[in-house]
Amino acid sequence: MPYEINHLSYSSISSYLMCAAAWKFHYIDKIQTPTSPALVFGSAFHNTIEQWLGGKAESLTDAWSKEWQKQTEGQVIDWGTDIPEELFNKGIDMLTNQDILAEMQNTFFTHAEMPVIETKVELSIPAVPVPIIGYIDIITSDKVPGDFKTSSKSWTTDKALDETQPLFYLAAMNQMGFPVDGWRFRHYVFVKTKTPKLQVFEHVHNPGQIMWLFGMIQKVWK
């Protein structure tokens, strides 16, 4: 890479793999492109859950209102056929849904210790002179890392297994000396269908997959 940077983020690597041209526009040329409604919703929802789990918000709906306002102000959004008010109300519906609330309580607070939110990790890779950084959404008290997702439709087990992000987090945790018991990872998928729900996928990775991960990131760097 001919430009000077002092680190890579996992999100930038993921963006590059999806579309190199879009990555260049965003990270190198600094060209601002309209944000999608799905990204606005996901970011606001993600932040709301983290605020609540971190004890920084007494009410999920109050936190959602504040985060929605933050995400919708000061940036260009391509709403397309989506209606902002409907998306905002969908967030309220999800955060007041009794099944989702019960699942969150049973999933995040089943042990004596509180979950850890937004853990920064760094991964060093041979032939890549800068660290790869990322932030793990949640590490529950059983030491299993996890990631929050929002989706317009239900996930499948295969989709969860196809995600490369968990392998990066697990490799970074292992390198930094965190416990990685069984190389387990969880996805918490908040599905914004007519009847919303929370899906929890736990899957196991193989330490041997690290070499594939290293090779993939080395190719991105070159």
Report residues per predicted region.
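Non-catalytic protein-protein interaction segments used by genome-maintenance enzymes to assemble
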Residues: 111-176
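Hydrophobic (often cysteine-bearing) scaffold residues that line and stabilize catalytic clefts
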Residues: 37, 41, 87, 162-165
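An N-terminal structural lobe/cap that precedes and organizes the functional/catalytic core
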Residues: 3-4, 8, 23-24
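A non-catalytic, helix-rich entry segment at domain boundaries
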Residues: 48-119
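Metal-dependent nuclease catalytic regions and adjoining charged, substrate-binding loops involved
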Residues: 7-8, 95-100, 128, 158-159, ...
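Nuclease catalytic cores
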Residues: 13-57
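Short, compositionally biased low-complexity segments
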Residues: 15-23, 56-76, 181-193
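Short amphipathic alpha-helical segments and their helix-coil junctions
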Residues: 20-32, 145-151, 218-222
